[in-house]
From Swiss-Prot:
An accessory protein needed during the final step in the assembly of 30S ribosomal subunit, possibly for assembly of the head region. Essential for efficient processing of 16S rRNA. May be needed both before and after RbfA during the maturation of 16S rRNA. It has affinity for free ribosomal 30S subunits but not for 70S ribosomes. Belongs to the RimM family. Keywords: Chaperone, Cytoplasm, Ribosome biogenesis, rRNA processing. GO terms for cellular component: cytoplasm; ribosome. This is Ribosome maturation factor RimM. The gene is rimM. Its main location: cytoplasm. The lineage of its organism: Bacteria, Pseudomonadati, Pseudomonadota, Gammaproteobacteria, Aeromonadales. PANTHER family: RIBOSOME MATURATION FACTOR RIMM. It comes from Aeromonas salmonicida (strain A449). It holds the Pfam family RimM.
Length: 173
C-alpha cells in the first residue's frame, strides 16, 4: 500500500465522551471531513477508522470516531497523523500541483546549474516558498535555498514525470 497523504493530526481529547480535537492541514479546514474513512498512523502502522460525527468548536474542529466512546479510549489516538490514499484527492487543473508532488524534485536554473532537491514547501502568506537542499559540493557553499514559488517570474517549468523544476534564480543567492 502506498503511504497515505497526511491531511492533519488528531489533537487532544475533548470532553468525556471520546471526542478529539482535529488539526487540519487542508486549505479549508473542514475539507478534511470530506474523506471518510481516514487512515491513521499509530506507531508507524497505518489503519482505517471512521468518523461518525464532527463539528466546529470555538475556532477549531472536533470529531467523534466510531467505537470510541470514552475519554480513556480517545487518549490512545492523540497526536496521530490523519491520512487518505492519494488517489482520493481531487484532480487539479493544468498548471496546479500538490506540494507532495514537488517534494523530491531536482531544481536547476535556466542556465543549467543544479541547485539541489526540494525538501519541503512553506506557506508565507504572500506566496509559497520552495526549500531546496543544496548539493554537498555546491560551488557557492549553500546548504539550503529558499526560492519563491512565483510562476512565470521564478518558476519557469515543472516536469513531474522527470521530477524536475527549472527556475530563473541566481545560484549565489
Amino acid at each position: 500500500m502506498e503511504k497515505p497523504v497526511v491531511l492533519g493530526t488528531l489533537g487532544t481529547v475533548y470532553g468525556i465522551k471520546g471526542w478529539l480535537k482535529v488539526n487540519s492541514f487542508t486549505d479549508v479546514a473542514e475539507a478534511i471531513f470530506d474523506y471518510n474513512p481516514w487512515m491513521i498512523n499509530q506507531n508507524g502502522v497505518w489503519r482505517e477508522l471512521k468518523v461518525s460525527a464532527w463539528k466546529r468548536h470555538n475556532k477549531g474542529l472536533i470529531c467523534k470516531i466510531d467505537g470510541i466512546d470514552l475519554r480513556e479510549d480517545a487518549l490512545a489516538l492523540t497526536n496521530v497523523e490523519i491520512g487518505v490514499p492519494a488517489d482520493l484527492l481531487p484532480a487539479l487543473p493544468e498548471g496546479e500541483f500538490y506540494w507532495r508532488d514537488l517534494i523530491g524534485c531536482s531544481v536547476s536554473t535556466t542556465k543549467g546549474y543544479d541547485l539541489g532537491k526540494v525538501t519541503e514547501l512553506m506557506e508565507t502568506g504572500s506566496n509559497d516558498v520552495l526549500v531546496v537542499e543544496a548539493n554537498v559540493k555546491d560551488a557557492f557553499g549553500a546548504k539550503e535555498r529558499l526560492i519563491p514559488f512565483l510562476e512565470e517570474q521564478v518558476i519557469k517549468h515543472i516536469d513531474l514525470t522527470a521530477r524536475t523544476i527549472e527556475v530563473d534564480w541566481d545560484p549565489g543567492f
